[in-house]
Amino acid sequence: MVESKNSYDLVILGGGTAGYAAAIRASQLDMKVALIERDKVGGTCLHRGCIPTKALLHVAEVAHSVRDSKSFGILSEFQGVDMEAAIKFKDGIVDRNHKGLSGMIKADGVDLISGEAKLKDQSTVTVSTDEGELELDAKNIILATGSEPKTIGIEI
């Protein structure tokens, strides 16, 4: 069963960097906005790419500095990296950023909808959620679904 249509000035498919930035800006311009994400808002950069990678890179830089601390006149002994603690550090950074982003989206009045979206026609988006299907009527639609790598089956 499809619920009644909800009308929006802008519906955005994909809650990664481009999608959430567009949603926040459109909301600031007084548009009624729905942002649809099938996973967690923030996309690859926040959850699996840029942010967690940089957090772990920071751990490596600190480890390197501790190992070379004698050159700074600091006496210490490097005993290795506790990977469980490093992963916990990384997860904490990702979680704080995700919560901050979610709060900002909510504060700007964007309707964040968790589900799988499909274009029904030029002004209608159907969203499959855990609660059922929604139909959203949109004056404008942005496709910000990102990309996924695909192997081409050639050995290199």
Locate each region found by the language model.
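Residues forming the Rossmann-fold NAD(P)(H) cofactor-binding site
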Residues: 20
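Glycine-rich flavin
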Residues: 2-8, 24-31, 36-156
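Glycine-rich Rossmann-fold phosphate-binding loop(s) that bind the pyrophosphate
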Residues: 14-17, 38-39
